[in-house]
Amino acid sequence: MVINSVLIIIRSKLNTLQGCPDPSQCQLLNVNRDTLFSFHEVSEKFLQQMVALYVASHYKNSPDDLQLMSDAPAHQLFVLVPPIAEDSKHLPEPLCVIQVALEGRISRESVKNSLSRGKRAAGDLIPWIVSQQFQDEEFAGLSGARVVRIATNPDYIQMGYGSKALELLVDFYEGKFANLSEDVNGFAEETITRVTDAELANASLLDDDIKVRDIRKMPPLFSKLSERRPDNLDYVGVSYGLTQPLHRFWKRASFAPVYLRQTSNELTGEHTCVMIRPLGSSEDIAW
């Protein structure tokens, strides 16, 4: 039971809203991972709700997913929440969770070396797939965001929350929430506390001091999209096991297929499909 609690393996019970808010009234918030994994009671409760959505909406989950969520350097977390009253003192219920991995900006030399050897480095899934399949040395130099997971509360499936969360995510990366009158120093930046190699070499589980961090010294758990500076991206993409409902979902969000694996996955029997959506206007897209 202790291991289950630490790794949040046991599925938490999902809350049920009193009524269903209109998707147009919901907002997408950025989640600060440093605060989310601070061991504070409030943050821990929300983390359990997020993991519960993951477990309820996907056939395969493991502690590795939790590790990626916590400290993968290029990952970002977003949650779609119902309207929040200004005087509310309660955590909002997550209707949908989106986990994103930033990819790309691979040097042309690295692409050439990998293509010549028929191998690719770990990570940067979509850039490497497109580069290998199309023998394209330019695409990997672009910057993109890959949707790793998008999980909606199973009680609210087919109600438009996933589509709304994805729409707001694309709007964020296109800079539609940016306030041009704001000073750049006013943006909230996520900082993940990391240890050095020297600290790891001298560390020991016997003398580790694991404790709840002072919540007063932590950044807010949530940030509005208008408070975050979006990364300068060229596209948003996704890689998933092809099914008719999933293809319909991504196509409706204006994603276009660029790759379909010829052989099926041994575990699921599905064929991997990669779809992307360019960001910005068509006049700005040179590729």
Regions found by a protein language model. Give the residues of each.
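Terminal substrate-recognition subdomain of acyl/acetyltransferases
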Residues: 1-61, 68-75, 79, 85-94, ...
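Conserved acetyl-CoA pyrophosphate-binding loop and the N-cap/start of the following alpha-helix
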Residues: 156, 160-165
